[in-house]
């Protein structure tokens, strides 16, 4: 699963997800992509589940790019712990995803295969997504 090798600080504020994605919202590497339509945190486990689903479906050929990285630590306190005594310890990592953000890109497979693979990955995501195609200028 994805996680940063090291960070400047162990813990982060939760933050807010206002507006739409201004970066990472267009296809850069592949021909087909899965785009987020809602704001959410996507965990490293969910990213990995989507990656596995796509690679299993499009087994021969095809290149996959993961366009999001979980760089935000989410803290949790132990169960049945009294209030106070500081913030909990980091438990898992999430990627902050805004509407319009590209999650996965794929190329080297037919559109029908890419569409089916992305649909399987979309079921693993906690948000609504859409399948998009790169505009090829000839």
From Swiss-Prot:
How would you summarize the oligomeric state and partners of this protein?
A: Part of the 50S ribosomal subunit.
Q: Which domain of life is it from?
A: Eukaryota
Please name the Pfam families in this protein's record. Ribosomal_L16
Q: Which biological process annotations from GO are given for this protein? A: mitochondrial translation
Q: Does the keyword Transcription regulation apply?
A: no
Name it: Large ribosomal subunit protein uL16c
Q: Does the keyword Plastid apply?
A: yes
The record ties this protein, via InterPro entries, to: Ribosomal_uL16 (IPR047873), Ribosomal_uL16_bact-type (IPR000114), Ribosomal_uL16_CS (IPR020798), Ribosomal_uL16_dom (IPR016180), Ribosomal_uL16_sf (IPR036920)
Q: Which classification does the entry list for the species? A: Eukaryota, Viridiplantae, Streptophyta, Embryophyta, Bryophyta
Q: Single GO molecular-function term?
A: structural constituent of ribosome
- Similarity section: Belongs to the universal ribosomal protein uL16 family.
Subcellular localization: Plastid, Chloroplast
One cellular component term from this protein's GO annotations in UniProt: chloroplast
Name the UniProt key words of this record, in alphabetical order.
Chloroplast, Plastid, Ribonucleoprotein, Ribosomal protein
């Amino acid at each position: 699963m994805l996680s940063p090798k090291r960070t400047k600080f162990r813990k982060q504020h939760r933050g807010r997800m206002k507006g739409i994605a201004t970066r990472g919202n267009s296809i850069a590497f592949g021909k087909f992509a899965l785009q987020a339509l809602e704001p959410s945190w996507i965990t490293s486990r969910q990213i990995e589940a989507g990656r596995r689903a796509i690679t299993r479906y499009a087994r021969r050929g095809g290149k996959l790019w993961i366009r999001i990285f979980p760089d935000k630590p989410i803290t949790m306190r132990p169960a049945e712990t009294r209030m106070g005594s500081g913030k909990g310890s980091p438990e898992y990592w999430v990627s902050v995803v805004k509407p319009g953000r590209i999650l996965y890109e794929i190329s080297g497979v037919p559109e029908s295969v890419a569409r089916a693979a992305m649909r399987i990955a979309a079921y693993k995501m906690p948000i609504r997504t859409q399948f998009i195609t790169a505009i090829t200028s000839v």
